[in-house]
Amino acid sequence: MVHLPLSRSRSGRRAVPDLSRYQQFYEADAADGYSTGSGLSSAAASVASLRRPGVGMGRTQSLTGYGRTRSLGAARPSYLGAPPRTYSMSSQRRANSLRSNNGFGPPAVAAGNTITVKTTETKDLQGRTRTVTRQTVKHINGVRYVETTTTMTMPDGEYPDDFYGFEGDFTAKQTSSGHVYQNARGAPDISDIAEEESLEEYLDARDTAPALRIQLRAPPRVQQQRQLQRQRRLSDTNFPARRSAKSSPARQSSEEPPATTKPHRIRFDETPQIVGIDPPTQKKAPKKQMTEQEMYMHALDAARKKVYGEISQPALEAKQPHRSTMSKRMTLRDEATLAANTPPERSRPAKREVRKKEGHSHHNFLSVLRRDSSPKRHAVQPSERVHNKEKTLEMTPDSSSASSYEEARFEHSDEMYNKALEVAKKKYHLTQENSTRDNGTTECPRTPMTSLMSTNVSSDTAESTLLGTPVYSSNAPFDRSPQPSSGCETGNTTPKSIPRRPSFLDKLVRFSQEKYGYRPRRSISSQGHKAEHEHVFTDDIPPLPDIPLVDPMQVKPKDVPLPTVEPALGPTDVSPARVADPESNIETPRTLAPARSSISSSPRRSSPPQAFQELVPLQSTQSETTGDLADALALGDNSLDLLPGRVSEISPKTSFEHFVLAPEVPETDEKPAAAPAVAAEAPLSNPPSVVVVPSATSSVPAAQGAAPGVAVTEGPSLGGPAAPVRALHATKTAAAPAKKRSFFHKLFKKY
């Protein structure tokens, strides 16, 4: 039930309105900064938004509100009209009234429709505006709309881009204030010249520019009309229809409207305008007719250039087939005979051979293998090729005749050959003088000799052959006759031979021959180089010492006095009956065995051949120490035995420093005993006489180095008669010290 107050008493008390009703209206607009009620009009709401909240909201003492007010600003302006009564029936403030929404006035939400615009400008340090920002805030039906627009100003240098779309042409129009030569007939168009100069750098725009953008074109009918107008304008001019090679495409017609969009490149017409002047043609001088001889000479030169290329005539003739080194070795004729039968162009050596003969490749390993064994000739043929290009004279054909050209060419080659021959002779004599000055000997006449050397001849042998000294092949039979002197026979002075250091090839050949025995060993002396008059060859067998050899099956006669037997260091078990029995004394054959051999790798360290002619016995500082001597006399597998009546080859690499006489015993299957021991020294002049005294037992320990039951004595030291030696056997069935013979020993013994 709604209570409607029909009247109001005028009593002293005042009716206080319910303020709680106003909260629902002021809460929505509190955020916008102004307080308005939904019942106010739109004009009152706009005015209320400009005032602070609470101003003019005081209580009035009259119903109309135009009475006295408690503030100065509470007066209501006249243009606002009379406000509605607060407590009347038609008041919109009262929610419980019947006419609160009667439709009078604007709706309640109309008070929030506002538009606010804010503009912000941004400037740089120079005061120039860079950006302009415009912000628009709209409140429509309680909804807030914010629009922000930012405008950027154009940077410097981009303003000329606005004029790219402007294609108007005003220079070609006839004006009263133009130049005089522009209006004259036949004068060039100034606009075309200016456009040529400005557009030369854009001639390759079609190649470098990116893909074309799609542009709107005029309809075909409009394009046809423009084409007709362009043709009419070209027909009015008096210029030729051609232009020079540097002309650029013409600009578009001035009748075309400027483009609406701003293009980023130059646009060319499909049918460019070409206007130019033909360059003057040069008149060629009339050719002079050539004679038949000149035509022939030109044809000959052209054919020669086509076949041989751009080379001079002397160099062309110098190209001859070169004789290989193998062909020179395989031929049986001498080089002088070949030089006589060979034309001078072919007989002249090549550049590589001349350098080899001059001494550019002395120590080259391949040059030793390729070196020719034939001696040098006195006349060295020079090379016809002239390596200095400045001195090469090119023969130009003479227009007189072909025969004169050929004669001049041959005369020129002969002169070159004679000059080159003189230069080569002078150089050859200077080389010979220098070589004789270095060697300190007089120059000897050199006689050519036929080479007998094979392919593997060393460098020193080849050089001795070139010097005129006969060199004997290592395959030839041995000859003890002295070699002829290599010195000159002018006077009594004999030049001394200079020793030469062996090269790598010499060492290689010597090592292969001496190590593996592919070929007989070369002749070497004790000093390691060839002597002048004496040549000692180690291929032959050295002489053996003068020692009488006895047949092993022969029994020594009883009347020969025997030397006394000296016992060894240890006591031996020898019975006197067996010592006195002369029938049991059987002399064993004597063999020659080396006590110690040293192998040397160099021929200079090898012992001289005179060491083979005498025996050097073993020498010991003390006669009591027989352990080392027994070890020296031990018969091992590597001992060298000289069989009786046979001679075995002694290697030159083995130097025999000591020779001792070792007994030879018959072969048995039992194990051999220890080696004998030597008790005294033997003189160098008399050969020692040795008798072996075997025994079955011996008290000398093996650690002391003494052999069991064997003692060797030697004769006097100064050539006196040898003392009698008696050899005693322990028993007839006792086995003597035996040595297992090798296959070669059995073979030599058989024959």
UniProtKB/Swiss-Prot annotation:
Biased composition (Basic and acidic residues): 345-356, 384-393
Region feature Disordered, mapped onto this chain: 54-88, 216-290, 314-410, 431-504, 558-610
UniProt biased composition (Polar residues): 431-496
Keyword vocabulary terms for this entry: Cell membrane, DNA recombination, Meiosis, Membrane
Subcellular location: Cell membrane
Superkingdom in the source lineage: Eukaryota
Comp. bias intervals (Low complexity): 216-228, 596-609
KW Membrane (keyword) present: yes
Primary localisation category: membrane
Swiss-Prot/TrEMBL GO biological process terms: DNA recombination; meiotic cell cycle
Disulfide linkage: none
Cellular-component GO terms for this entry: plasma membrane
Topology in membrane: Peripheral membrane protein
Function per UniProt: May be involved in the control of meiotic sister-chromatid recombination.
Protein name: Meiotic sister-chromatid recombination protein 3
